[in-house]
């Protein structure tokens, strides 16, 4: 009987407490977006998350398809090609 009480005491100590109302936020696109069933007004859906919800990104986020960091310096000289 003492062994049963010891087991229950250990089980209660090890188990994490359950907090109602808090949900785990599933992030996507390298922690830039949030997985949601429907995106907010200022967000754009992009691809899908593991749980088949939309990956919602802020409208100002730029997406790099190549996977490498790009230079985002948008000066006037870099917008147009130089003419000979």
From Swiss-Prot:
Transmembrane segments: none annotated. It is found in: Secreted. InterPro entries: Defensin_big_dom. Its main location: secreted. GO terms for molecular function: lipopolysaccharide binding. Keywords: Antibiotic, Antimicrobial, Defensin, Disulfide bond, Secreted, Signal. The keyword ATP-binding does not apply. This is Beta-defensin 119. GO terms for biological process: antifungal innate immune response; defense response to Gram-negative bacterium; defense response to Gram-positive bacterium. It holds the Pfam family Defensin_big. Belongs to the beta-defensin family. GO terms for cellular component: extracellular region. It comes from Pongo pygmaeus (Bornean orangutan). The keyword 4Fe-4S does not apply. Has antibacterial activity. Residues 1-21 form the signal peptide. Disulfide bonds join 28-55, 35-49, 39-56.
